[in-house]
């Protein structure tokens, strides 16, 4: 047995499923998950000594690549002064100033510890500010594991929420309305059915949890207009897209102004950090200045703030996003060319430093139904064959891939060459 197999066997006796987040268990592709020894730049190194070109990037945070010296040094320096104080620090102020400067729609920001905390807090704030209970989310969009967001979409344009996980009471989920991503008619139908009851829409501007599905040109502006028409708030979940699709996020890339924004992943530089913020009048409703309660023992802790501050200062340097786009575009085009040579039907979506690989005969993939029609079994085979080639993709047909500026054009070309060999055997 390999070291990964031995560790996985031991882990399953001690940790549910052997992992601390389900997708890591390779349930979406089968087999034994890799246990990682270290990472540097664009590469992961497993406990058996094999190197992989990494397109998971810790599920998005590693936009600069692994073990970036500026972030590493900032963490070491901060740790020498203490790990946690439970009191305000200067770095929290500097971090808040940096975030609000980089994302102009955020007048104020509150730091938390995860993307889930950011989205659940933003929704509570929207409900408290509007005095309404219902929310709209979209089929295939994931916003963390808060109870009100673990809702399965049924057939049709509009579905009253049904819990997607045991342990979520139906009474919690009933206020969550599920609409179809990239379908404004389904959203209008929800508002017309509940015109005075919907507090907010929460949306991934690029749906990154049904692989990678960008918005149609009219979709995000249409959501803004509907929120304005019916008095609801628009929450854009930029946990994946923030500082990756563009410096000011997908909201800037697509030209839409939210009332609230949720951030995570890149904002922590690899440390556990989330944030939410937006309009000053809305944020003023948050405790201690307002009645909507939110708190966290480790929120704004000095290590995470130091890592995030260092990361965002690097990400803000000229040319970063142009490099991400160039590398991702080359990868997407190369994969399509290699698939065409092998007569493999393939769609590759990409935006900035995000991409999605779909085995499908369809011309395009624009919604949850398109994603579910893709050939998952072929993806599983593709994943494992690419792993043998030393390329680590997301171990699920429903998760986006992530590029970093640490990837070289040689890494991209080597990945395309590996895919060409794999396509020939599929």
Curated annotation (Swiss-Prot):
Its EC number is 5.4.3.8. Pathway: Porphyrin-containing compound metabolism; protoporphyrin-IX biosynthesis; 5-aminolevulinate from L-glutamyl-tRNA(Glu): step 2/2. It is found in: Cytoplasm. The modification N6-(pyridoxal phosphate)lysine is found at residue 265. Gene3D superfamilies: Aspartate Aminotransferase, domain 1 (3.90.1150.10), Type I PLP-dependent aspartate aminotransferase-like (Major domain) (3.40.640.10). It is an enzyme of class 5 (isomerase). One of its GO terms (cellular component) is cytoplasm. This is Glutamate-1-semialdehyde 2,1-aminomutase.
């Amino acid at each position: 047995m390999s070291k990964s197999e031995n560790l996985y066997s031991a882990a399953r006796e001690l940790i549910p499923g052997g992992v601390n987040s389900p997708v890591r268990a390779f349930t979406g592709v089968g087999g034994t998950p890799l246990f990682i020894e270290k990472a540097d730049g664009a590469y992961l190194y497993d406990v058996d000594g094999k190197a992989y070109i990494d397109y998971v990037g810790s599920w998005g945070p590693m936009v600069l690549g692994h073990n970036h010296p500026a972030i590493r040094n900032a963490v070491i320096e901060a740790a020498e002064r203490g790990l946690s104080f439970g009191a305000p620090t200067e770095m929290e102020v500097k971090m808040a100033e940096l975030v609000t400067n980089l994302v102009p729609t955020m007048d104020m920001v509150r730091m938390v510890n995860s993307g889930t905390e950011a989205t659940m807090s933003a929704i509570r704030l929207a409900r408290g500010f509007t005095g309404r209970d219902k929310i709209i989310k979209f089929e295939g969009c994931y916003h963390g594991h808060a109870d009100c967001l673990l809702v399965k979409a049924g057939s049709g344009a509009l579905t009253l929420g049904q819990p997607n996980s045991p342990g979520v009471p139906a009474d919690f989920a009933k206020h969550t309305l599920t609409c179809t991503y990239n379908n404004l008619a389904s959203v209008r139908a929800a508002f017309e059915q509940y015109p005075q009851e919907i507090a907010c829409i929460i949306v991934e501007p690029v749906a990154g949890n049904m692989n990678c599905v960008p918005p149609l040109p009219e979709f995000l502006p249409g959501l803004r207009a509907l929120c304005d028409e019916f008095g609801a708030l628009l929450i854009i979940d930029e946990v994946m897209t923030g500082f990756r699709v563009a410096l000011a996020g997908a909201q800037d890339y697509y030209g839409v102004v939210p009332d609230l924004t949720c951030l995570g992943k890149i904002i922590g530089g690899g440390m556990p950090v989330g944030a939410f913020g937006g309009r000053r009048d809305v944020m003023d409703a948050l405790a201690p200045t307002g009645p909507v309660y939110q708190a966290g023992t480790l929120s704004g802790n000095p290590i995470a703030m130091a890592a995030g501050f260092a990361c965002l200062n690097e990400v803000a340097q000229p040319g970063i996003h142009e490099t991400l786009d160039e590398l991702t575009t080359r990868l997407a085009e190369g994969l399509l060319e290699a698939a065409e040579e092998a007569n493999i039907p393939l769609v590759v979506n990409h935006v900035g430093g995000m991409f999605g690989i779909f085995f499908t005969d369809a011309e395009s993939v624009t919604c949850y139904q398109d994603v579910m029609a893709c050939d998952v079994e072929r993806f599983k085979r593709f994943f494992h064959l690419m792993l043998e080639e030393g390329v680590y993709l997301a171990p699920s047909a429903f998760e986006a891939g992530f590029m970093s500026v640490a990837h070289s054009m040689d890494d991209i070309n080597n990945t395309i060459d590996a895919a060409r060999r794999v396509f020939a055997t599929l």
